[in-house]
Amino acid sequence: MTATPAHHAATAISVVPMPARLGAEILGVDLRQRPDADTFAHILDALHRHGVIFLRGQSLTPEQLAVFSTCFGELDIHHMTEHVFPHLPQVRVLSNVKKDGKSIGITKGGMHWHSDLSYKPQPALVTLLYAVECPPTGADTQFADMYAAFADLPEAKRKKLQSLRAVHDRNYRYSELYPGRPPLTPEQVAKVPPVEHPLVRVHPATGRPALFV
C-alpha cells in the first residue's frame, strides 16, 4: 500500500499516513518552539484523522515537551509521583534502564492493553510519549484502533454495547499486574476510586464511536 503525503501550503507540514489504517507521520515540525495556531491546527487535524501521530527526530528538553503538551490543554499530574521531575511533575519517566541498581523510571508501565487515565472521571484527551532511546525495530509500544474494533462488530452487538457501562478501577489487580512494585498506599488508592464509563464513547471532535474497554 502506498501512502500519499498531504501537504499544507500555509506551513511546511506534511502528513504521511501509515500503511495500516491507524497512524500517520508528521514532517516539517520542530517542537523545540511552541507551534503557532495554524501549525497546531494541522497537527490536531492529523491526530483526529489518524488516531496516532508520530513526529520523528525531535530533540526536546522536559520543559519543551511540557510546553508543546499544553497546546492540547491543561496537563494532568499523575497520582503516583515516583519518577517525575521535581520542578515538572506533569512529566513522568518510563524506562527499563537501571543506574546503581535502581530504575531511573517507571518500569513495565502499561504492559497490558489500556487507555491512559480511563480510571478518572474525565479520561485523558491525549497522551504524549517522547522516546529518548528505543530499538531500531520492534519494541513493546503498540496501539489499537478502537474505532475499527467497534465498526467491525455485527450491528446487533454494536447496538447492545452502546447501552452498557463498565467500571474502570485503577487498583484492580494492581499487585498482580505489577509484582515488582510496592503496593499502593491508602492515600494513592483514595485518590482514584472506581468510576463508570460507557462501553462506547463518541469522540467529541470527530463524532466517531469507539470501544472504551
Model-derived regions: residue spans:
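Non-heme Fe(II) oxygenase catalytic core, chiefly the N-lobe of the double-stranded beta-helix
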Residues: T2-V213
